[in-house]
Amino acid sequence: PQTNTYIEKDLSINDEIEKLRLSTTSSLLSGRRDIIVVSSVSCIYGIGNPDDFSNNVISVEIGKKINRDDLLRQLSDSLYSRNDIDFTHGKFRVKGDTLDVFPAYSDIAYRIIFWDDEIEEIDSFNPITGSRIESLSSLTLFPANIFVTSKDKIKTATNDIQLDMFKQVEY
């Protein structure tokens, strides 16, 4: 501009578009063949590594033996955030043996009930009213963010950053 005015670019993420991007990616990875992708401005931005995304998909089913804390860790690794008060997209909450998950790509939330280290019940429910929609025998949860990555890549990046930091300090 002629006035030497800097105009800051706004790179804010529209929550609804992000939800649709995650929904599309999840549907494609689930094997659905009836997906239509319509271009939007968000298409100019990259997505994460599809292998990392699919490696962070969580599958649960009634009768499956899994420690509740291990499942919570898997949810955190898939970029879900624990929030027992503000239950919104991409969050989960825990109360005793009950785990509620609100996927970032869905308007339906899911309740997983444990009996010791076994999944006893899986239900879908309306996250606003809390009313039960249906009982499920299994559930597939896709990552809460398209930029999910592996622990190995995080460790490598952390080590590289630390080495760079030490080099800068010496410099």
Describe every region a protein language model picked out.
Residues 1-171:
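ASCE RecA-like P-loop NTPase motor cores
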